[in-house]
From Swiss-Prot:
Monomer. CDD domains: ADK (cd01428). The keyword Transferase applies. This is Adenylate kinase.
C-alpha cells in the first residue's frame, strides 16, 4: 500500500471524508490544509484574521503561507501521510515536489475524486460551514477549474494519478480508492 498520498478534487468532492477514513484504516497522518487554516482562523491570530478575509471571499490563501504550514507538519512525520487540499495550483505542486525531494519523501500516489458541479453545490450548501454560501461556492469552483485542474495533467504525466468517481456512497468511493492504491 502506498504511504505518501495526495487527494485532489473540487470543493465538496469528499476528499476530507475519504482521507479521514483512509488514514484511520491505514495509520497515515492526515494533513488537511483546510483544517489547518480553519484552526488558524479559530485561534484569532493575526495570520488567522488575514486567512479568514481571503477564505470568506472564496479565494485561495497564498502559496507561501500554505507551503510553510505543510512543510512544518511534514518535517515532523516519520510514517506515511495523506495531503488533502494542497497543492491547489502548479506553482504549489512544483514547490511541494521540491520540498518532498529535499526531505526524501517522494509522492507515491494521487487520487482525483470527480464529482459533478450540481452535486457539489448541493453538498456544500447542506454542509453548512460559514464559508459555504452559494456565491462563495461558485467562486471556489471557478478557481478550482482555473488553478487546480491543471494538476490533473501534471500528475497523469508522472504516472501517479488515479481517477475515482465521487458521486457514489461513501463506502463505495472508499472501496474504489483502496483498489486503486492496492
Amino acid at each position: 500500500m502506498k504511504k505518501k498520498l495526495l487527494f485532489l478534487g473540487p470543493p465538496g468532492a469528499g476528499k476530507g471524508t475519504q482521507a479521514n477514513l483512509f488514514c484511520k484504516k491505514y495509520g497515515l497522518i492526515h494533513l488537511s490544509t483546510g483544517d489547518l487554516l480553519r484552526d488558524e482562523v479559530s485561534s484569532g491570530s493575526v495570520l488567522g484574521i488575514k486567512a479568514a478575509e481571503i477564505m470568506n471571499k472564496g479565494e485561495l490563501v497564498s502559496d507561501e503561507l500554505v507551503l510553510s504550514i505543510v512543510e512544518g507538519r511534514l518535517l515532523n512525520i516519520n510514517e506515511g501521510w495523506l495531503l488533502d487540499g494542497f497543492p491547489r495550483n502548479v506553482n504549489q505542486a512544483n514547490s511541494l515536489k521540491d520540498l518532498l525531494e529535499k526531505i526524501n519523501q517522494p509522492l507515491e500516489g494521487v487520487i482525483l475524486i470527480k464529482v459533478a458541479d450540481d452535486y457539489l453545490i448541493k453538498r456544500l450548501v447542506e454542509r453548512g460551514r460559514q464559508d459555504d454560501n452559494e456565491q462563495v461556492i461558485t467562486n471556489r469552483l471557478k478557481i478550482y477549474r482555473e488553478k487546480t485542474s491543471p494538476l490533473i495533467d501534471l500528475y497523469k504525466k508522472q504516472g501517479i494519478l488515479e481517477e475515482i468517481e465521487g458521486n457514489a456512497d461513501i463506502d463505495v468511493v472508499f472501496s474504489c480508492i483502496e483498489k486503486s492504491l492496492g
